Amino acid sequence: MTDSIPKKPLKKGSLVFVDKENYIKSIEALASDHDLPNYVFEGPGEILSVKDEYAQIRWRRPVPDVWFKLEQLKEYLQ
């Protein structure tokens, strides 16, 4: 029995953080600042909206909301 538990899809209201390895390898990283703040990688951020393969994230800080690819996000577990 090697059936694994299916991964729960990220949706509006999910708490997430950015997976640093996936982000650094992405084309979005080439077009952005290479020195992102640590809170992006530590989390939690809340998904406000999902459109196609992107999610809009709001951090618990006084900073603008940001769009990331869903494949660059991981669920935040406390």
Swiss-Prot record:
Membrane topology: Peripheral membrane protein
Top EC class, one word: translocase
GO cellular component, one term: plasma membrane-derived thylakoid membrane
GO molecular function: oxidoreductase activity, acting on NAD(P)H, quinone or similar compound as acceptor; quinone binding
EC number: 7.1.1.-
Keywords: Membrane, NAD, NADP, Plastoquinone, Quinone, Thylakoid, Translocase, Transport
InterPro entries reported in the protein's UniProt record: NdhO
Catalytic activity of the protein: a plastoquinone + NADH + (n+1) H(+)(in) = a plastoquinol + NAD(+) + n H(+)(out); a plastoquinone + NADPH + (n+1) H(+)(in) = a plastoquinol + NADP(+) + n H(+)(out)
Subcellular locations according to the entry: Cellular thylakoid membrane
Main location: membrane
Coiled-coil region: none
A Pfam family recorded for this sequence: NdhO
Protein family (similarity comment): Belongs to the complex I NdhO subunit family.
Quaternary structure (record): NDH-1 can be composed of about 15 different subunits; different subcomplexes with different compositions have been identified which probably have different functions.
Role description: NDH-1 shuttles electrons from an unknown electron donor, via FMN and iron-sulfur (Fe-S) centers, to quinones in the respiratory and/or the photosynthetic chain. The immediate electron acceptor for the enzyme in this species is believed to be plastoquinone. Couples the redox reaction to proton translocation, and thus conserves the redox energy in a proton gradient. Cyanobacterial NDH-1 also plays a role in inorganic carbon-concentration.
Protein name: NAD(P)H-quinone oxidoreductase subunit O
